[in-house]
Amino acid sequence: MELHLALLASPLPAAPGRRSLPRSSFATNSTTTINQTHLSPEKQEKLQSLLDTWAEHNLLTFLKPVEKCWQPQDFLPDPSHLSPTELGDAVREIQERAAEIPDDVWVCMVGNMVTEEALPTYQSMMSLVLGGTGADSNPWERWIRGWSAEENRHGDLLNKYLYLTGRLDMRQVEKTIQYLIGAGMDIGVDNNALCGIIYACFQEKATFISHGNTARLANHHGDTALAKICGLVAADEKRHAAAYTNLMRKLFEVDPNESMMAFAHVMQARVTMPASRMFDGRDPRLFTHFSDVSQKIGVYTVGDYSEMLEFFLKEWDISDVVDGLSPEGRRAQEYVCGLPEVMRKLAERADDRRKKLVNAGEPRYIPFSWIFNKQVRV
C-alpha cells in the first residue's frame, strides 16, 4: 500500500505545449463529473468477463502458496522456544542493532508500517471496484483476498519488530493505525475499475521503492536484520506491482480508449493517497510531515515518482497506441505522455527549495509523537 508525497496529491498542471484535458472529463470537483468516470454496464461486464478468464492463468499465478511464504515469526524471537534469559538476550540484540538508526529513519519506518497496517481499507476498496461481495469465487475476488493475505504479513512483522527495538512510543503508533483505518479513504476514482487498477499499479510500485530504500538505510546504519525484513516486504511489493502492471497492459490491449482516459483521470484528479488521513491525535498535518522526512532522506521522492511514471508509460507502450482511441482518448494520451517533463521540473524545484533552505541556514524541525516527540529536521 503506500505513500506518495503530499504535493503529488494535488492535480498536476497540463503538460507544456499541450492542451489541458476538459475538466468535464477528468476533474473530480463535482458529483456530476465524478459520475462520468463510471464504466458503462456493458464495459463493466466486458471487464468482468476478461478477469474471469485471463486472470485465472495470468494474475493468480503471482500469488505464492501459503506454505511457501515467509511468516513474521520466522524473523522474531520465539518465547515458546527460548528461556526467559535467552529471550531477554534476543531482545537486547535487536535493541543494540537498532541503537544507531537515526530518528528520521524511524519516522519513515513507522510511516511505512502504519500504512501497511491499514490493509482492511485497501482490501475493501479493491473488492468494491467491481462490485464484489468479498466472498465471491471469481478470479478477481480470489486475487484480492490472496493479495491481501500476503500483504497482511508486512504490517504484522514490521509492527512486532519495531516494538522490540524499544525506540518507539508504540501507544502513539497504535493510535495512528486506529485513526487511519477509522478514517477510511476515497481515492477519487468513484469505483471505476480501470482507475482503481491503475492506482494500485502506482501504489504497489511506490511501496516497493519505499521499503527498498528503508532496507538500504537500515543496512547502512548497521541493522542487517531490519534491512532484511524491509527487503522481504519490498520483494513482495515488487511481485504485486508486476501483477497489477501486467493486468493493466492487457486492459490497454482490450480497451485502449477507456484505459487511456482512466490513466489520464488518475494522473490529473485530486487523488487521495492511502495514508493521507494519517493522524496521531496530535498533529493534523502528520502525513505531510512524514512525507517531508521521506523526501529529505531519500525514502520516497518526487524523482522516484517521476521515474515510476516514465516506467509505466514505457511498460504500457502509451505513446505507441494508435488504434481504438477517440478524440478524447487522444487528448488523454497527449496529456500523460507530457507529464514526465512536468514531473522532472517538480523534482528540480523541490531540490532547489531544499538547497536554498540549507544554504540559508533555516532548518525546520518537526516533533513526532512516534519517537517521543523528538524533533526531526525536514
UniProtKB/Swiss-Prot annotation:
| Record-level GO cellular component terms | chloroplast stroma
Compartments, as annotated in UniProt: Plastid, Chloroplast stroma
Keywords annotated in UniProt: Chloroplast, Fatty acid biosynthesis, Fatty acid metabolism, Iron, Lipid biosynthesis, Lipid metabolism, Metal-binding, Oxidoreductase, Plastid, Transit peptide
The keyword Iron is annotated on this UniProt entry? yes
- Transit peptide location on this chain: 1-23
**What cofactor requirement does the entry state?**
Fe(2+)
GO terms for biological process, alphabetical: fatty acid biosynthetic process
Q: In which tissues is it expressed?
A: Preferentially expressed in the flower labellum.
Main location per the UniProt record:
plastid
Query: Which CDD domains does its entry note?
Result: Acyl_ACP_Desat (cd01050)
State one Pfam family annotation.
FA_desaturase_2
Which residues are recorded as binding Fe cation 2?
151, 204, 237, 240
Q: How does it assemble?
A: Homodimer.
The job of this chain, per UniProt, is described as: Converts stearoyl-ACP to oleoyl-ACP by introduction of a cis double bond between carbons 9 and 10 of the acyl chain. Converts palmitoyl-ACP to (4Z)-hexadec-4-enoyl-ACP by introduction of a cis double bond between carbons 4 and 5 of the acyl chain.
Similarity-based family: Belongs to the fatty acid desaturase type 2 family.
Q: What is this protein called?
A: Palmitoyl-[acyl-carrier-protein] 4-desaturase 1, chloroplastic
Q: Which organism is it from?
A: Ophrys sphegodes (Early spider orchid)
